[in-house]
Amino acid sequence: MKGYAEEKGVTLCMEITNSKVAADQRTDQVFDRLAWGLGVCRAVNSPRVKLVYDVYHVQIADGDVTRNLRENIDRVCHIHVAGVPSRQEIDGTQELNYPFIARTIADLGFTGFVAHEHRPGPGRDPVKSLEQCFEIMNV
């Protein structure tokens, strides 16, 4: 696959998830630790094989979200964000400081996509919730 991706100029993106939360739903999980995915990237040694850096999953499985991002940004093709622990909004009701994470991403010069896995909390207006998430990430 590496050769084909390189020939066609496409990037294969592997998403790291975690096997701690809802482990019964992830019985076939392969990429459940950041180190494992980074090891695959190093072993394959191609600029066309990278990681989807899912902030929610990295926090649950490994922690050190911004340090890990800084140390491995060259292996990241796409970033997912979601609140921890709820997997909902990325606002102040969650344990992560998303304005700081957003500034870190910008400071690293990341030019890929950052996607919010948007799932409003109970009773939240979906549009207002999404607007708030955009304001948080727009640095």
What are these regions (language model features)?
Residues 16-27:
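Active-site-proximal beta-alpha loop/turn segments in soluble metabolic enzymes
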